C-alpha cells in the first residue's frame, strides 16, 4: 500500500491574532488555543509547540484541555513559576477537527505563544496552479 507524500506547513495558532500571544483570560471556560482543520490540505494532523509566560508574582497553574475536558484523559496540568517563560508542549499531535483550550488558576496573567506544524498531503499535480470548487492548488498545497 502506498501512502501520499506529506509535507509540513507551519501555521499560526488559530486562537492567535497574527501570531501574537493568547491571553488565558478564564479560570473555568477554556480559551481557544488551536483547532485542527482537517479541510486544510486534507491535513492529517497538527503538531503543536507551545510556550507559556506567567506574568504574575505568584506561581500559577495552566490546564490545557487537549481535545476534550475529561480528567485525566484530556487534561495537561502544568505549574508555572512566577515571572517564568516555559515550553509546555513539545510536538504533541491533534487531529480530527479537535481543539486545544486553556484555563489558568488566575485570569489574565498567563500568555500562550506557539505555532502548529500541519502535516498535509501534497497535491499530485504540484507543478500546476488551478482552481476547483472548494480549493485552489498552488505549488502542491491547497490554499483557502
Residue locations for each model-derived region?
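Noncatalytic modules at the cell exterior or secretory-pathway interfaces
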Residues: 92-109
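Short, surface-exposed beta-strand/strand-loop-strand elements in extracellular ectodomains
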Residues: 55-77
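Short, solvent-exposed loop/turn segments enriched in Ser/Thr/Gly
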Residues: 40-49, 93-95
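Short proline/glycine- and polar residue-rich coil/turn motifs
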Residues: 78-85
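Buried hydrophobic-core signal for structured, non-transmembrane domains
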Residues: 48-53, 100-102
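Short beta-strand/loop motifs in extracellular/secreted proteins, especially
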Residues: 46-48, 58-62, 108-112
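C-terminal interaction-tip segments
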Residues: 1-43, 104-144
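Exposed aromatic-hydrophobic patches
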Residues: 85-91
Amino acid at each position: 500500500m502506498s501512502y501520499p507524500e506529506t509535507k509540513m506547513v507551519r501555521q499560526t495558532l488559530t486562537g492567535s491574532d497574527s501570531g501574537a500571544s493568547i491571553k488565558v483570560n478564564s479560570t473555568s471556560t477554556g480559551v481557544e488555543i488551536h483547532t485542527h482543520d482537517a479541510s486544510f490540505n486534507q491535513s492529517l494532523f497538527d503538531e503543536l509547540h507551545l510556550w507559556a509566560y506567567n506574568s504574575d508574582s505568584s506561581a500559577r497553574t495552566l490546564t490545557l484541555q487537549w481535545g476534550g475536558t475529561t480528567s485525566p484523559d484530556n487534561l495537561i496540568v502544568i505549574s508555572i513559576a512566577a515571572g517564568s517563560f516555559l515550553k509546555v508542549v513539545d510536538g504533541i499531535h491533534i487531529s480530527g477537527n479537535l481543539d486545544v483550550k486553556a484555563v489558568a488558576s488566575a485570569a489574565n496573567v498567563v500568555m500562550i505563544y506557539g505555532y502548529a506544524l500541519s502535516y498535509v498531503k501534497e497535491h499530485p499535480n504540484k507543478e500546476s496552479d488551478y482552481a476547483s470548487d472548494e480549493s485552489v492548488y498552488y505549488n502542491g498545497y491547497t490554499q483557502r
